[in-house]
From Swiss-Prot:
Residues 8-227 form the Radical SAM core domain. SUPFAM superfamilies: Radical SAM enzymes. It comes from the Bacteria. It comes from Staphylococcus haemolyticus (strain JCSC1435). The gene is moaA. Its cofactor is [4Fe-4S] cluster. This is GTP 3',8-cyclase. InterPro entries: Aldolase_TIM, Elp3/MiaA/NifB-like_rSAM, MoaA, MoaA_NifB_PqqE_Fe-S-bd_CS, MoaA_twitch, MoCo_biosynth_MoaA/MoaC, rSAM.
Length: 340
């Protein structure tokens, strides 16, 4: 283990998010709108994706640099064939203490048991409404919320620790906050509401569509008796609250109204093998895939990863204003390449 590395703003590296595919079986407007990601959209060919062997090699070196947590993302990660094999290999890396996955949940019954047997224990399921019609309008694939709720119940039944992520958009699904808090409170499943972010280039974001953390909290407090919960660790992105009657928790992620750049410890590996220091990056990522395919040693890879982190100075959300979003000259990476 080398000495702990820090970026230009003094932030250590502790988390690595690995996007295993740019494909998804949903077409949510805030991520992959169907008007752009239509039937003729060309996704990455297989040889442009990192292999599992390459992902494991990169993760091993990152573990030597201080990474403790891995998160598998997409696109929709369950579309990557034989994903359980990757989980099993990542689970053997010294120093990795936690592996999670973010998914839309549609294929959990198909793949969940193999993933659990491979060592995956934590899943975040993206579910933006509990009402079938609202959810179908969001995913644009006629998938009912009840279908995903059934998949969540299955995942819990075989032992997974499940959290639910909800991106809230004003006038689209903000009426889902109270019924979803109520539903998952009774299930004692943690739900996290996320402020609508300007990820990618095609989701039509502006401030008028954001429901802030304080607005969400006011809604929830008017219906439930709750109290705040202290953060569990440095860099925790959600502000947590618990119900006083049964202790069930929910979180609010202030990605717009109160940024958490100063405690961000995440490196991101895109589905095409590039390093990014921020979800909102407008700078082309360093191509780790090409670098390792050129025949470099692990020592050379380690030095490159150290350099990439040492020069990191991303703080996009700290600097975001409506004007900077409108005047942005360079495109950001789309979320299907980098995960949420």
């Amino acid at each position: 283990m080398v000495a702990q590395i820090k970026d230009k703003l003094g932030r250590p590296i502790r988390d690595l998010r690995i996007s295993v595919t740019d494909r998804c079986n949903f077409r949510c407007d805030y991520c992959m709108p169907k008007e752009i990601f239509g039937d003729d959209y060309v996704f990455l060919p297989k040889d442009e994706l990192l292999t599992f062997e390459e992902m494991v090699r990169i993760a091993k070196v990152y573990a030597e640099l201080g990474v403790k947590k891995l998160r598998i993302t997409g696109g929709e990660p369950l579309l990557r064939r034989n994903l359980y094999q990757l989980i099993a290999e990542l689970n053997q890396i010294d120093g990795i203490e936690d592996i999670g996955m973010t998914t839309n949940g549609l294929l959990l019954k198909k793949h969940g048991q193999k993933l659990y047997d491979a060592g995956l224990r934590r899943i975040n399921v993206s579910l933006d409404a509990i009402d079938n019609e609202v959810f179908q309008a969001i995913n644009n694939r006629n998938i009912k919320a009840t279908t995903i709720l059934d998949q969540i119940d299955y995942a819990v039944s075989i032992g997974f620790h499940v959290k639910v992520n909800v991106v809230i958009q004003k006038g689209i699904n903000d009426d889902q906050i109270i019924p979803m808090v109520d539903y998952f409170k009774d299930k004692n499943i943690e739900i996290r509401f996320i402020e609508f972010m300007d990820v990618g280039n095609d989701n039509g974001w502006d401030f008028s569509k954001v429901v802030t953390k304080n607005e969400m909290l006011d809604m929830i407090e008017s219906h439930f008796d709750i109290e705040p919960v202290p953060p569990k660790y440095f860099g925790e992105v959600a502000k947590y609250y618990k119900h006083k009657d049964n202790g069930a928790q929910f979180g609010l992620i202030t990605s717009v109204s109160a940024s958490f750049c100063s405690t961000c410890t995440r490196a991101r590996l895109s589905s095409d093998g590039k390093f990014y220091g921020c979800l909102f990056s407008t700078v082309e990522g360093f191509n780790i895939k090409s670098f390792i395919r050129s025949g470099v040693t692990d020592d050379e890879l380690r030095e490159q990863l150290i350099t990439l982190w040492n020069v990191r100075d991303d703080r996009y959300s700290d600097e975001r204003t409506e004007q900077t979003v409108k005047n942005r000259q360079r495109k950001k990476i789309n979320m299907n390449y980098i995960g949420g």
